[in-house]
Swiss-Prot record:
Its main location: cytoplasm. This is Ribosomal RNA large subunit methyltransferase H. S-adenosyl-L-methionine binds at L73, G104, L123, S124, P125, L126, T127, L128. It comes from Pseudomonas aeruginosa (strain UCBPP-PA14). It catalyses: pseudouridine(1915) in 23S rRNA + S-adenosyl-L-methionine = N(3)-methylpseudouridine(1915) in 23S rRNA + S-adenosyl-L-homocysteine + H(+). Belongs to the RNA methyltransferase RlmH family.
Amino acid sequence: MRLRLIAVGSRMPRWVEEGWQEYVKRLPAELSLELVEIPLNTRGKNADVARLIRQEGEAMLARVQPGERVVTLEVEGRLWSTEQLARELDRWRLDARTVNLMVGGPEGLAPEVCARSEQRWSLSPLTLPHPLVRILVGEQIYRAWTVLSGHPYHK
């Protein structure tokens, strides 16, 4: 099974990379979790933010192949318990398509990305810093896998 986290933003602090890698390395070989970073466009005082978001969205969608699943991470998405995420992960595995988890920039996701989405997932009703979202997604995917495999990590 192949999961891809496509996230706007690059040049994250070392602790973010280390946190992400900690959970990626724990996953079994049959569950691949890849990070694809989309550069954040420069936001100046007079920037056309709508245009920048659209460009970031185009770059995100360019990484998605036809037929692949798109899941957007949005505050307005569905909140899943660990067990619900484990069920989704199992469905995704049975579906046998690459799953792209999309995380937008500071202003969110482009409408085109949301329109392509098959599912909307919310980690929390709180506004979370994007670097932390990467680690949370990695940990939650790992935790969901442990539920499915009967591993004692999730008790």
